[in-house]
Amino acid sequence: QELYMYQDDPLGVSYQALNQALYPDHPLGVDILGTEESIKATTYEDLRLAYDTFYHPSNMNLIVVGNFDPQALLAVIEANQARKTFEPPRYHRVEEEVTAPVLPKTQLEREISQPIIELAWRFAPENLSGLELIRQRIIGEVFFELLMGPMSSAYASWYQQQWVDTNFYQSYHLDHKMHHLAIHAQSHHTSDLIAAI
């Protein structure tokens, strides 16, 4: 039922089409919900492996922000984790390079009240990790927020011309293999908005 609800959501479908266009022939472009057939074929063991993999400490990061003593907090965390035991990870990470070019244009036909626009630019992957990855991600997010976020002059101009409404947003993604900017909008002025962006 959740799969059908997702497939009936125009925004979710358009976002998945965007990922498929950005990362064709790559796991990043594959719908994580799967298909009706793959869902029916999923076993308890599959779900257990997915859960154990996702929530395994070797696959997690802890980011803490605030006014605290870092050493005292680290001592609390280490004491908490020392009481726990974890099996070695039961998975082998397979990383595929993103090699296929971005698909230039995808168009979906649906009966909706307002056209949906998904624009995206895929950037070269960055070989970053740890604090440098977080730092560069924040820099990108702030930059694009200043450039076209709701407080920017560009957004104000587009909003005044009724090219965008409150459904306009941009999202910057920087991770191990994923690096792109995506712009999402609902507009009856698609050509004007695309030209302005």
Identify the role of each PLM range.
Residues 1-90, 123, 135, 144, ...:
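Charge-rich, well-structured scaffold segments of protease-associated domains
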Residues 87-153:
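His/Glu-based metal-binding/catalytic segments typifying zinc-dependent metallopeptidases
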